[in-house]
UniProtKB/Swiss-Prot annotation:
Residue span(s) of the pro-peptide: 18-23
Family statement: Belongs to the peptidase S1 family. Snake venom subfamily.
Protein name: Snake venom serine protease homolog rhinocerase 2
Biological classification of the source: Eukaryota, Metazoa, Chordata, Craniata, Vertebrata
Keyword Transcription attributed: no
UniProt-listed InterPro entries: Peptidase_S1_PA (IPR009003), Peptidase_S1_PA_chymotrypsin (IPR043504), Peptidase_S1A (IPR001314), Trypsin_dom (IPR001254)
Keywords (A to Z) from UniProt: Disulfide bond, Glycoprotein, Hemostasis impairing toxin, Secreted, Serine protease homolog, Signal, Toxin
Signal peptide: 1-17
Glycosylation sites: N252
Annotated S-S bridges: C30-C164, C51-C67, C99-C257, C143-C211, C175-C190, C201-C226
One Pfam entry name: Trypsin
Length: 259
């Protein structure tokens, strides 16, 4: 398992070395072996993916609070939505954990949901966890985004396979300048391409932002239409919530979410 995780991190590093002129909008199809930690969320009624998430270990998934629905189904090991991988699995939540409640998030705060699975997933060729970050992210980092979100801006077009792209991590002030109403301080990250053309978009919410090989962000909110110049997207800052996440996983009943 360790060898496979290291190999996946190497794939991510090689992906960062590519030019960022790719079109999730603006991206290319992800390599099938690049995203074993990427999960897809849908409801029992609908097979259409409405969000993504990240597998932390065999029993826990991290995604955005805005992705909460009744009767969520979580798919693991998915690449092509129309072609089932031999190790593909589906699970349902046993527990959902939020900061206060599922309705208290905003586009700049507490958009995070930690899900405990009713039954652990099995390790597989296309199923492997991604660790929480050991260090905070650095402004200027090249970051990887991925998901089954729309790959066009004006007319929604959902791909069969997840798309990946490289974007840049900016100072939070860049997003404050781009969007009215954001507070002076926030536990969110600001990332994108200032020239436009590359961005996370519809259904990419909840998916990972991976900077220099570390899981640093959760897709939270982007401008509409997506991928516009000078309009980076907002991502929940995972590092700010690591104590809360680790406390819940350790069954620490006194742990609290950052204020």
């Amino acid at each position: 398992v360790l060898i496979r995780v290291l190999a996946n991190l190497l794939l991510l590093q090689l992906s960062y070395a590519q030019e960022s002129s790719e079109l999730v909008i603006g991206g290319d199809e992800c390599d099938i072996n690049e995203h074993p930690f990427l999960v897809a969320l849908h409801t029992a009624r609908s097979k259409r993916f409405h969000c993504a998430g990240t597998l932390l270990n065999k029993e826990w998934v991290l995604t955005a609070a805005r992705c909460d629905r009744k009767n969520i189904r979580i798919k693991f090991g998915v690449h092509n939505k129309n072609v089932q991988n031999e190790d593909e699995e589906m699970r349902v939540p046993k527990e959902k954990h939020f900061c206060v409640s599922s309705k208290t998030y905003t586009r700049w705060d507490k958009d995070i949901m930690l899900i405990r699975l009713k039954r652990p997933v099995n390790d597989g060729t296309h199923i492997a966890p991604l660790s929480l970050p050991s260090n905070p992210p650095s402004v200027g980092s090249v970051c990887r985004i991925m998901g089954w979100g729309s790959i066009t801006t004006t007319k929604v077009t959902y791909p069969d396979v997840p798309h990946c792209a490289n974007i840049k991590l900016f100072d939070y002030s860049v997003c404050r300048d781009a969007y009215k109403g954001l507070p002076e301080k926030s536990r969110t990250l600001c990332a994108g391409i200032l020239e436009g053309g590359i961005d996370s978009c519809k259904v990419d919410n909840g998916g990972p932002l991976i900077c220099n090989g570390q899981f640093q962000g959760i897709g939270s909110w982007e401008g509409h239409p997506c991928a516009q110049p000078l309009k980076p997207a907002l991502y929940t800052n995972v590092f700010e919530y690591t104590d809360w996440i680790e406390g819940i996983i350790a069954r620490n009943t006194t742990v609290t979410c950052p204020p």
